[in-house]
Each structure stands twice: as C-alpha cells, then as structure tokens.
A protein has these predicted regions:
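WD40 beta-propeller blade core
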Residues: 31-32, 131
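Beta-sheet repeat architectures centered on beta-propellers
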Residues: 8-11, 54-57, 68, 75-243
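Beta-propeller domains
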Residues: 1, 33-43, 48
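Structured, hydrophobic secondary-structure cores that serve as assembly/anchoring elements
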Residues: 15-31, 54-82
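Blade-loop segments of beta-propeller domains
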Residues: 2-13, 46-55
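Short acidic-glycine loop/turn motifs at beta-strand connectors
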Residues: 26, 34-35, 125-126
Length: 243
C-alpha cells in the first residue's frame, strides 16, 4: 500500500507507532492513519489519513507510557504527551515539559522508558547528562529530575563531567535496568564504560548494604586497609562506605 499525506507542507516522516490508530510523527505534525470509523483495517481502498495536531515531531523514537505516548517536539527542547481521545476519535498533544524548561532546553537527543519498578522516562541531553520524567498516564502527577554521571570528560562546550552517549532499557530479574555508555577521561585517555543503574532502594529492604547509589561503584568483600583496584579513579573525588 502506497499512500501520500495530504498536507500543505512537504513533511518528513520520522516515526510510526501502533495504537487504535497508527500515529505518524512528521516534521509537519502528528497524523493518524486508519481504515474507517466502522473498520480500522487499512486497505488500498479503505483508509483515512488525518492530521491531528500541528505540533511537529523530532527524529527521536517516542516512548509509550501506558496508553499515552511521549515524544520530542521538532526543536528537541520540549516533550509532549500524545493521548487518544475516544470522544473526538483523534490524538491530542499537550506539553509535559513546561516544568523543566531548563533541563530539556539543553536539547534532548534520546528517549527510553523504564517501566518497572517505577514509571520513568529517561532523556539523554546534548550535554551528556540525563533528565528523568516520572509520569503515568492514569495519574495527574509529573516529576522531573536531573542526573549528572560521576567522572570527568573535558569538553570546552559541554562541560567537564562524564558524558552519556547512549541508553537502553533491558528487562532483568523482574524489573527494567537502564544501561548506559558513558565517556570519561581516564589517565589521559578517553574511554567508554558500559554501565547499568542498580535497582532503587525500597523502604521494605532489610539489607542495608543495598542503601547506596553510586557512580561506577566497586565493592570489596574482604576487610582491608589498602587496595589497588581504583587506578581508573585517579584525580577523582571518592567516598568510602564502610560497615
């Protein structure tokens, strides 16, 4: 099936996401594609292609959260949430980043969604830091956080902190793990580490050794007053958690 979008502008298609109707993110807005009001099946002779909103999309894969979809606006400095209105039989787009202009204003480069144990949408920003969005489509509560990964990586434009270059979410042990590729300067060389975020500490945990959250942390089981395991942390500030 070959279809042409009927638009007053020449638009580039960036992504297509499934749903009750196909949502199509373009440089000219969000379109929905379906068969008809009585049959959603798309055929060469049975289709409808309608623009639901003129808020354009960026070339970044959106994140599906429940029955909603979070996508990056064309300028990469705003996030919008796309929901399907059964009453109007169309998608509706509203900004969800108005409380975090200083964060997402740094330009969003990538989105991933961590469903379990908490509903978190992670944004990789242009400066290599992360922004996290706490959001569930059934709850009218939104929260934002900013996360700078430990370590140094000299950059006259983006700053001297470590830079996250890529993200992925992988299911593991009944939860979702956020995996990162992090760029750092170590002993005069630029290196990249593959890291993952440990699970969040829950108040119900009885093991107090789990009550820490560190960057690129190492754990030593045997008692010792000296160690040679931390050469990669030369010139870095460290803290020791002792029991």
């Amino acid at each position: 099936i070959s279809l042409t979008i009927d638009s007053d502008t020449v638009d580039e298609i960036y992504w297509i996401e499934e749903g009750k109707k196909l949502a199509i993110g373009t440089s000219g807005g969000i379109f929905n594609l379906y068969g008809s009001e009585t049959s959603y099946t798309i055929t060469p002779t049975n289709f409808s292609l309608i623009r639901d909103t003129s808020w354009e999309a960026a070339d970044i894969k959106p994140a599906r959260v429940g029955n909603a979809m979070i996508y990056v606006q064309f300028n990469r400095r705003k996030l919008r949430v796309l929901t399907f209105s059964g009453e109007d039989v169309q998608y509706e787009s509203s900004e969800i980043s108005y409380q975090a202009d200083e964060l997402v204003g740094k330009e969003v480069k990538e989105l991933v969604y961590q469903k379990q144990p908490h509903s978190l949408t992670w944004c990789r920003l242009k400066d290599g830091t992360l922004a996290s969005l706490s959001f569930e489509d059934t709850m009218p509560v939104v929260g934002w956080g900013h996360h700078t990964i430990g370590g140094t990586q000299a950059d006259a434009t983006l700053g001297n902190h470590a830079k996250v270059e890529s993200m992925a979410v992988i299911p593991h042990d009944g939860r979702d793990q956020l995996w990162l590729i992090v760029k750092r300067d170590i002993n005069g060389s630029t290196v990249r580490y593959v890291e993952f975020l440990e699970k969040f500490y829950e108040p119900s945990e009885t093991d107090q050794e789990l009550a820490h959250f560190v960057d690129c942390g190492l754990y030593k089981t045997a008692s010792s007053f000296t160690t040679a395991q931390f050469a990669h942390l030369k010139d870095e500030s460290i803290r020791i958690l002792g029991d």
